[in-house]
Every structure is written in structure tokens, then in C-alpha cells.
């Protein structure tokens, strides 16, 4: 199957998962998976959230951002990492994360897949 994101409807989700500004995405859903091409404008973010019953994989296409992640042990320290085009991010089931566009002038564009486990 080929998914042509640019031919699908663009969804605009304000304050997605408690984040800042808007998250824009072209999305594909079936019974088991959510796959999307996402876009965060400068200063926009996806809020910190936990993956229960799923994991998430993100491949950064362009821009730069900040990933905040925490293991399933909620007493553990949150880790912060800079992400750049070409980076692949993985959030296992039970872990939490957020993604912020830290650029002042470039969108953060990425593919993401959330398979049901």
C-alpha cells in the first residue's frame, strides 16, 4: 500500500495533547495503526503524553526540535534531546514524550507511526 499524504485532508489540531499552538497533520488510520505526516510551526509542540497500548516511531524530515522523554518509571528523570532532519525517534509502550519545534523560522516536519500493540 502506498499512502499519499499530500493527497489526504490536512487536519489542524490546536493544543494537541496539551501542547502549544497547532499541530497540523495529514493522517491515515486503520483498525491497528495511525500513520501521519506532521508539521509543527516554530514554537508549536505536541504536549507531554504517555503511550499506553501503543508505541510511536517518528522520522524527522526537516527542521529541528526538542524531544522530552521519560521511561515507564514516572519517578525517573525526564531526558531532553535535540532532534534534527534524519533522526528517528522511538517511544516504547509505557513511556512518555513530547516534541517541540525549537526553531525560530523553520517548520518541523516528520512522519510518525503509532501501531496498536
Residue ranges of model-derived segments:
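A short, N-terminal "cap"/entry segment at the start of jelly-roll beta-barrel domains
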Residues: 1-34, 47, 80-81
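Residue-level recognition of conserved beta-strand positions in structured domain cores
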Residues: 37, 50, 61, 69-71, ...
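A short beta-strand-loop-beta hairpin characteristic of the jelly-roll/cupin
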Residues: 55-85
Amino acid at each position: 500500500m502506498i499512502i499519499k499524504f499530500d493527497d489526504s485532508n490536512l487536519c489542524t489540531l490546536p493544543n494537541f495533547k496539551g501542547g502549544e499552538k497547532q499541530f497540523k497533520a495529514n493522517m491515515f488510520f486503520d483498525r491497528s495503526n495511525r500513520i501521519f505526516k506532521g508539521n509543527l510551526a516554530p514554537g508549536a509542540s505536541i504536549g507531554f503524553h504517555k503511550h499506553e497500548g501503543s508505541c510511536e516511531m517518528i522520522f524527522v524530515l526537516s527542521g529541528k526540535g526538542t524531544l522530552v522523554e521519560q521511561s515507564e518509571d514516572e519517578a525517573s528523570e525526564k531526558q531532553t534531546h535535540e532532534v534534527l532532519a534524519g533522526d528517528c525517534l522511538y517511544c516504547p509502550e509505557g513511556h512518555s514524550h513530547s516534541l517541540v519545534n525549537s526553531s525560530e523560522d523553520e517548520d518541523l516536519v516528520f512522519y510518525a507511526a503509532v501501531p496498536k500493540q
